[in-house]
């Protein structure tokens, strides 16, 4: 992949080219009750900044070698086990060992549960939401002698139930509980002389929450309802703070009408609760709504979308910068900047 990063604001410019590649080779061995997959991969990420002033260049070349093995085992009629282990060697940052496990319990024909967990990591980079907010201005390069991998440990459990009422109404519900522990999170800290430096915190971030998804079907209608609660906190030096740009409450709802090979009609609405911002303020709550219609024929279809038809955008209920137009200080973008959009088209089947 190739990404040309260019930012131009009054009295400051940022420009650079980012390229990334991924390659993998794997071998699969399948038997009656088990399946093995093993392989290796190579991942690269390179960024070269254009020298526009005397500020240190934020160039980097990240290369990761990995090897993995995973197994799926139908232990019994009611238990499926999936296990895996991955070892990555990240040049300049060392080895990351990543086990994972997942168990699916088929308790009845209508009720099942899944329990899982695993490790993860992230390589330090200047390209984060925090640094993007200030257009990477005065952000010092990542220092491989100071910075290190962010390592995460997580687990989740979910419960699934499905049934039919009166032979016409289908109902299913999924209830998920999750927890993630992020050790040594990478934080952007203000330094002397107006500079910013990414520092790995000595603390941690923990994220816990629940997610509920309901699906109801009747004839050609389907209703999807969802609710997500997320509580994310930074533990640092004995102080507990909520992390920014994480709404605690999200609600989604989608109503679909679909006649196979004839019509598709959809109405959707999404709610986002107030959330803490990086500058200490609290963002506003907002709702996004959309409507879509598609008419299908044998060889083609015609569709039209009405996106965000309530015209919810951050510039209507909050600011996106402080200061002057010629010398702005940009705030977090937590809601759409585009308002009501209409788009349509024709799909051809060849």
Predicted regions and their residues:
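C-terminal beta-signal and adjacent terminal beta-strands/loops
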Residues: 183, 295-350
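Face-selective signature of the C-terminal outer-membrane beta-barrel domain
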Residues: 1-93, 106, 165, 169-177, ...
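Transmembrane beta-strands of outer-membrane beta-barrel pores
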Residues: 2-6, 31-33, 42-48, 85-91, ...
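Transmembrane beta-strands of outer-membrane beta-barrel proteins
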Residues: 36-40, 81-83, 113-115, 155, ...
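Membrane-embedded beta-barrel scaffold of Gram-negative outer-membrane proteins
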Residues: 1-8, 106, 114, 148-208, ...
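Outer-membrane beta-barrel strand-turn architecture
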Residues: 29-33, 73-81, 97, 105-109, ...
């Amino acid at each position: 992949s190739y990404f040309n990063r260019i930012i131009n604001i009054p009295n400051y410019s940022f420009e650079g080219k980012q390229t990334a590649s991924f390659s993998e080779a794997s071998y699969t061995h399948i038997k009656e009750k088990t399946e093995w997959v093993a392989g290796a991969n190579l991942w690269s990420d390179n960024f070269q900044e254009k020298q526009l002033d005397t500020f240190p260049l934020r160039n980097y070349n990240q290369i990761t070698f990995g090897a993995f093995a995973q197994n799926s085992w139908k232990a019994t009629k009611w238990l499926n086990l999936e296990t895996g282990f991955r070892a990555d060697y990240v040049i300049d940052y060392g080895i990351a060992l990543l086990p994972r496990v997942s168990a699916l319990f088929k308790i009845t024909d209508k009720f099942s549960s899944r329990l899982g967990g695993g490790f993860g990591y992230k390589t330090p980079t200047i390209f984060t939401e925090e640094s993007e907010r200030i257009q990477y201005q005065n952000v010092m390069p990542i220092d491989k002698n100071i910075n290190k991998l962010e390592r995460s440990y997580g687990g989740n459990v979910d419960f699934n139930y499905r049934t039919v009422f009166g032979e016409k109404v289908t109902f299913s519900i999924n209830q998920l509980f999750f927890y993630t522990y992020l050790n040594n999170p990478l934080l952007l800290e203000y330094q002397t002389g107006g500079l910013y430096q990414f520092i790995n915190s000595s603390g941690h971030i923990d994220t816990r929450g629940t997610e509920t998804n309901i699906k109801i079907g009747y004839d050609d209608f389907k209703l999807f309802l969802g609710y997500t609660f997320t509580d994310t906190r930074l533990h640092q030096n004995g102080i507990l703070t909520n992390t920014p740009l994480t709404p605690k409450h999200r609600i989604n709802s989608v109503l679909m009408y679909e006649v196979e090979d004839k019509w598709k009609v959809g109405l959707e609405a999404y709610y986002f609760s107030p959330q803490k911002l990086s500058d200490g303020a609290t963002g506003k709550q907002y709702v996004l709504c959309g409507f879509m219609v598609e008419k299908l024929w044998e060889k083609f279809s015609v569709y039209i979308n009405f996106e965000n038809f309530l015209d919810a955008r951050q510039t209507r209920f909050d600011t996106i910068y402080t200061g002057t137009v010629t010398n702005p200080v940009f705030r977090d973008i937590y809601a759409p900047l585009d308002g009501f959009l209409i788009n349509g088209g024709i799909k051809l089947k060849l």
